[in-house]
């Protein structure tokens, strides 16, 4: 005894009974791509598998294209409004993502002018972003991509 100090602190507080309600509201207000149909253009098998898994895990339906030409053809053959967004790799064989985007934008159908097209590329320099915009892409995301950022971008562009 006689060594040290003892403190007694009393802090009155109320127990938050609405915490569950707020957590549910936060979940609802969180960005979602559930139910969206996304055209995924990617020539690398592993990258395709990862992106497809991520998108499906977030509740999206995915159609796959392995090069720019295939992407243009899938979009051309689709019903107007069938796809909600296109995730476009840039460096692909047969036709790159820039050329594919220009071709899609030039198609004579209303949704071709407005469908969100998002560049997915390892090149994240300002000039790459500018080139994507010039080709008609709405947004640019660097690989490897952050899932929450990708979902946020798709949600923002679609809604």
Segments and roles (model prediction):
Residues 1-159:
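C-terminal compact regulatory domains
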